[in-house]
Amino acid sequence: MAVLSTIYSITRASTPTMASLTNDSPSPLPSSSPSKLPSPTSPSKKPLKLRQVSKQMGSQNQQRRGNKPSIAQIERAFGSGSYRDSEGEMDMNTVFDELLLGHANKFESKIEKKLREIGEIFVARTEPKLRSSGKPVLMFTIQWILPIWIMSLLVACGVIKLPFSIPFLDDLIM
């Protein structure tokens, strides 16, 4: 926001000096020494060029004053804020097409097609091994971990009383 206010103050400060120039008078150009300016008595073509330059600058200044950008345009130029139209209609269409049609309407390059095929081959080769390797883990969980967890829960709730008394365990449960 500080950048925007600085830009605005710089343009406001520089606009009145240029706007005060008339189209008929030559614009004062910055020069390093006053001797380089043409003398008004000597006949030369530079005053004519200076008049043309000042007329062009005057018309540009009028265009600048007439076309002040809005705050939204300034924010868009700096990239702050989000706008719906910046996403583009093409992106919206591809998402819509993928939801309805799957990948039937998607155009793939050769590299994308090759990567997809390699991925499908990798899944086809490794999936049966992963499915069979999950069975021992499931059986261990059902046979050992689940019964121990259920017994611990019943003891903690007080449904099952232990035949011995340990003060630490009693304090922990209660």
From Swiss-Prot:
Membrane topology: Single-pass membrane protein
Location of the protein in the cell: Plastid, Chloroplast thylakoid membrane
Biased composition (Low complexity): 30-45
One GO biological process term: photosynthetic electron transport in photosystem I
InterPro entries: CRR3
Chief location of this protein within or outside the cell: plastid
Keywords: Chaperone, Chloroplast, Membrane, Plastid, Thylakoid, Transit peptide, Transmembrane, Transmembrane helix
Region (Disordered): 14-71
TM region positions: 140-160
Presequence positions on this chain: 1-54
Task of the protein: Probable subunit of the chloroplast NAD(P)H dehydrogenase (NDH) complex of the photosynthetic electron transport chain. Required for both formation and activity of NDH. May function in assembly or stabilization of the NDH complex.
Miscellaneous section: CRR3 is not conserved in cyanobacteria and seems to be a subunit of the NDH complex which is specific to the chloroplast.
Protein name: Probable NAD(P)H dehydrogenase subunit CRR3, chloroplastic
